[in-house]
Amino acid sequence: MKLRTLFFLLQLFMPMLALAQYKPVEQASTLTFNIKNLGFNVAGSFKGFDGTINFDDQNLAASNFNVTVDAATVNTDNNLRDGHLRDEFFEVKSYPRIRLASTKLGGKNGKYVFTGMLTMKSTTKPISFPFTADLVNDAYVFKGEFKIKRKDFGVGGTSTVSDELEVNLNVTAKKL
């Protein structure tokens, strides 16, 4: 009976074991954002990518993303503003990472839909957005964009900064 149970468990988990695992490449990946402040566009970025991506375009049901960025790396090319964002908006000493984790992936032929959870500070919210995945040599290049409302995540209070911002992801992940 134990052998039958073991065989069943192996069959159940074998697709997950066969998935190719990828890790974000810091130097080739970007997370950028655009937001309005006093009516002017402000562009910024984050670095410090970490996490794992298990991806097989033929087995999306078993594929998943669990990626973080370092909140303290926020950069808008203005040191004074960046310090304010780290301390007052992102509270990086208490909340050092921003996490994006999938719960479901859909699509085909290089065009997909990410459904999952975005965590900033102590708030986790559902998120869904289209993305592309292109295999280049032994690495995938994942690109997607979405809009969020910063106040939904408790980021910053009332200020002259717009609530809505656009986020662009361009993540290169190498096969482990």
Residue ranges of model-derived segments:
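Low-complexity, acidic/polar, glycine-enriched regions of mature
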Residues: 20-176
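Bacterial N-terminal signal peptides
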Residues: 7-16
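Positively charged n-region of N-terminal signal peptides that target proteins for export
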Residues: 1-5
